[in-house]
């Protein structure tokens, strides 16, 4: 239900603040604009609509506590909480993804980045362009700046990585921003010398682990060796380096991402077990996206939203089993959504906000100076379509980038209130759309969300999480609350 009540009739509606509702099994889920929720039986919901729910009924008290009933004081509190949830709208882009090269030493069956061979050094960012990118990044009004190195394999162009880090640290002595660096790498070109530099500059390191060695190496081919063995070796070595600095291993370690392919679907437990074996306490189960090589190989490695959800829910069920046995492991997407559901805090995950982060939360810089709304927009460009290019350095100013047509168009297309399906959805307070994904899969930035794979997956994930919450198992609810806890990793912010 949307903010109007024309679809419901009942004298109780005039007592209520705007809300949305939808089925949750044989019950009804109600949500309000700041993400508070109540699960009711159909009979209880009918009584709420008719204004016949007794004031001392447990559900009445819950609705009152969660600001569903209208009053001036409640309206003011809701306005303040809404402003807090949406404070990201006024900060400017904080995530700056820098593609220092398209070259890569691995060949992935799903490569979204359209990688190039190691011999092709025409796709490296020059030191001069690296400095121009940094100059542009520091024009953002955001008090926080995260510079994320991607590729290709960013370690292939180590000089550009070093130049960007050193020049950013130098500029920040006067800019005074909360500066953070992140490196997304397959780790196969890591050396002790590079690691020492990254540690000295407090760079977060993230890699890919697609599950057990057999699955990982089938997805990610490394000439002359095992991509999994190399990644595992350096994960352990980097974790040791953090520990040698006296850092808490629960906070400071190599993060890992997983891309699900068809061969992954029948191994949810094995995938989770591999992350536990590697000492990881979080796993990010990511579906394929319609970008890069994944488009060409989809018939071999792809699947339906329903097949992915069967895998995903089996993996989450197993994680909950492990947690009950004392093994700490969480799933990142679930943790992000649970933070939105169970807390007053919004984690500002750029893919799940309204409007999305394209241009106004993140910007992507290609090796050649071309600038894009986001990394996904840059991926579309590598497929031969420049629809999401917002400028080119050094000729485009920061103002030019922010006022470009793609930034404006994606802000409109990702505002959920502007989407006929999303505006009525009970999950609207927790969700977000990706116009670039819509464009790649369905040919338009608004998309046809009824048949949209991404929408089906997020809707299914929220169905699962709310279903578990509604079961009322206190042990599971405790695990879910723990998944929402974010501890400060201040060591990664040493340049402010």
Region roles according to the model:
Residues 100-107, 153-156, 422-424, 428-429:
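Cysteine-centered iron-sulfur cluster-binding motifs in ferredoxin-type domains/subunits
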Residues 103, 107, 111-114, 428-431, ...:
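Cys/His-rich metal-chelating microdomains
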Residues 2, 217-232, 236, 240, ...:
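Radical SAM enzyme [4Fe-4S]-AdoMet core and its adjacent flexible, acidic
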Residues 15, 21-44, 334-456:
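Accessory C-terminal segments flanking Radical SAM cores
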Residues 6-39, 58-97:
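N-terminal [4Fe-4S]-dependent radical SAM core
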Residues 134-150, 450-495:
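Short Fe-S-cluster ligation motifs
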Residues 130-150, 157-290, 304:
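Radical SAM/AdoMet-radical enzyme domain recognition
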Residues 90-128:
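Canonical Radical SAM [4Fe-4S] cluster-binding loop centered on the CxxxCxxC motif
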């Amino acid at each position: 239900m949307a903010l109007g009540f024309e679809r419901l009739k009942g004298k109780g509606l005039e007592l209520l603040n705007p809300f949305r509702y939808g089925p949750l099994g044989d019950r009804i889920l109600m949500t309000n604009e700041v993400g508070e929720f109540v699960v009711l039986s159909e009979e209880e919901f009918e009584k709420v609509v008719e204004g016949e729910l007794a004031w001392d009924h447990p559900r009445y008290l819950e609705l009152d506590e969660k600001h569903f009933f209208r009053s001036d004081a409640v309206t003011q509190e809701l306005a303040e909480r809404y402003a807090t949830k949406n404070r990201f709208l006024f900060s400017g882009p904080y995530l700056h993804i820098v593609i220092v090269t398209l070259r890569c030493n691995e060949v992935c069956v799903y490569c979204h980045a359209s990688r190039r061979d190691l011999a092709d050094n025409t796709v490296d960012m020059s030191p001069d362009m690296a400095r121009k990118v940094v100059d542009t990044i520091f024009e953002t009004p955001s008090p926080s700046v995260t510079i994320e190195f991607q590729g290709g394999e960013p370690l292939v162009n180590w000089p550009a990585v070093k130049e960007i880090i050193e020049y950013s640290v130098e500029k920040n002595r006067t800019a005074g921003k909360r500066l953070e660096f992140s490196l997304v790498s397959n780790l196969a070109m890591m050396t002790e010398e590079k690691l020492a530099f990254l540690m000295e500059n407090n760079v977060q390191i993230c890699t890919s682990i697609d599950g057990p060695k057999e699955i990982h190496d089938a997805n990610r081919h490394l000439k002359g060796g095992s991509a999994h063995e190399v990644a595992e070796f350096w994960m352990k070595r980097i974790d040791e380096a953090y520990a040698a600095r006296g850092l808490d291993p629960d906070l400071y370690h190599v993060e890992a991402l997983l891309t699900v392919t068809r061969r992954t679907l029948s191994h949810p437990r094995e995938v989770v077990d591999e992350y536990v074996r590697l000492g990881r306490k979080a796993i990010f189960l990511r579906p394929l996206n319609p970008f890069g090589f994944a488009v060409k190989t989809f018939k071999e490695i792809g699947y339906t939203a329903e097949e992915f959800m069967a895998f995903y829910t089996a993996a989450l069920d197993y994680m909950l089993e492990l947690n009950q046995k004392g093994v700490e492991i969480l799933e990142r997407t679930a943790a992000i959504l649970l933070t939105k559901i169970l807390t007053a805090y919004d984690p500002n995950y750029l893919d799940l906000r309204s409007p999305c982060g394209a241009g106004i939360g993140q910007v992507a810089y290609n090796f050649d100076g071309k600038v894009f709304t986001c990394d996904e927009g840059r991926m579309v460009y590598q497929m031969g379509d420049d629809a999401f290019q917002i400028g080119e350095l050094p000729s485009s100013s920061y103002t030019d980038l922010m006022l470009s047509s793609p930034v404006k168009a994606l802000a409109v297309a990702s505002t959920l209130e502007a989407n006929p399906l999303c505006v009525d959805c009970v999950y609207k307070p927790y969700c977000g759309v990706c116009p670039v994904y819509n464009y790649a899969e369905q040919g338009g930035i608004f998309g046809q969300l009824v048949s949209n794979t991404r929408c089906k997956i997020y809707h299914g994930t929220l169905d699962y999480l709310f279903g578990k919450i509604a079961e009322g198992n206190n042990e599971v609810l405790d695990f879910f609350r723990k998944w929402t806890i974010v501890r400060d990793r201040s060591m990664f912010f040493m340049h402010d």
